[in-house]
Amino acid sequence: MSIPTVINAAGRAVMTELNGKPAIPFRGVGKYRPSGNRYGPPIPSCTDFPPDGNKVVTTLEEALLRCGIRDGMTISTHHHLRDGDLISNRIFEIASVMGVRDLVWFPSASFPCNEPVIKYLEDGTINRIEGSMNGPLGRFVSEGRMKGTAVLRSHGGRVQAIQDGEVKIDIAVLVAPSSDSFGNARGTGGNSACGVLGYAKADAMYA
């Protein structure tokens, strides 16, 4: 069944529905006033962790299992490591081996180093990407080869989507150059110092 389209304020035909959700076409600057309330983040609890506060696990696979990874989840990542981010690739490699399907990848951005993710778009591990897509991955999406519909989000628009409940993060994988055993991370130290980790703040709060 085809999805209806409308002409937005920029004169472009756009869909009224994206990935099964209603879409609000651009009406012009200052023409749309949102309603409702911000989405509340979950309440954290120390009861979910060992008495000594040590949250360390030995592998990313174990971490994903403990988070209850399953079909259709939204997994977020940040891009502070830029073109050196190999962890995002590993997330979906693990998910593919587990047989997990139709994930939504919600990165703050992706880079040429994430080209291996194309394999997991093709085999159905990932349904779609909602974020900034660059390099070979951006080309793949632009050619219409992704199963779901891509949603390109600015950095600020991404945070807005999180806080307004438009996107609900199931698992946030937040890479950091260094961290203590309780999970207090920083962008200095280690072999991959990258500076402040601001892009990951909303993910840490709302996942």
Regions found by a protein language model. Give the residues of each.
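Conserved alpha/beta enzyme-core scaffold
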Residues: 2-207
